Amino acid sequence: VAGGGSFDEIIEKIDIGGPSMLRSAAKNYSSVAVVCDTHDYSQVITELQEGGTSLELRQQLAAKVFARTGEYDSAIGRWFADQAGASLRYGENPHQQAGFYPDSQAVGLGAATVLDGGKELSYNNWLDLDGAVAAVNDLPSPSAVVVKHTNPCGAALSSDSPCDALEKAWEGDPLSAFGSVVAVNGHFDLACAKFMGGPNKFVEVLAAPSFDDEAIEFLRNGPKWGKNLRIVQISDIGSKRNQLESRRVWGGNLVQGSDDISAFDANLQVAGEVALDPSLENDVRLAQVLVKHLKSN
């Protein structure tokens, strides 16, 4: 890989037999000493000269084999993932290189379909899209979330239609919503498109589980910014993530399970003595969802 070989040349050099023999020997460490590191030669030779290798040494050698073959397989996996990914124009800043590499399990953004037309999704677009989808996943359908700089600046649920939710979410902060990323967890129809294509509106990305053809045509040919709009279809919007989340830190990775608990799935407990007005229950749940997804004050 470092030498710049072609795809076929690199595939040809993937070792199958070597790791298999090492793993087979390591599995039988109780009877076999397997050496994959030249630094272990002297200790193995010393014990052999004394009559035979100890069980403790053989176990240490086996552990090193499984770690080494695991690293080898991981390196191959990362290389394959790189081939399946997409380079982005740049990262958070113009001087940073960036790319998007979907998981092998085709879910969420990794299974999203960017519909024909529109500009390429940028690194920041992907971040905002992830934030919008994560928030709308915590809301009952139909709901809409408007995100700017990874933070929700508008969100609403409706008992009527996705268009109604969209209108209410936009009205939360129309100024911040200008140039935002919007996610809806219901079908995006022509009514939604006509609202979004109205005066004093502009969005970078629209995401929904499904779109009417008439809605797409209206957006592409209506507002001036429609030809550049990224329209993203994510069929499993509304699903729980149920995945490990990792964050790169200097010298390692922090890993935790995804926070899939939504305020709309939990029982509300009143901490004070004043009972909650039932008419405000959805407002309280919505506020809790937004607090969960806000990254600044």
Which stretches of residues belong to each language-model region?
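ATP-dependent carboxylate/acyl-activation modules
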Residues: 68-297
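Active-site loop-to-helix "anion-binding N-cap" substructures in soluble metabolic enzymes
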Residues: 1-77, 159, 186, 224
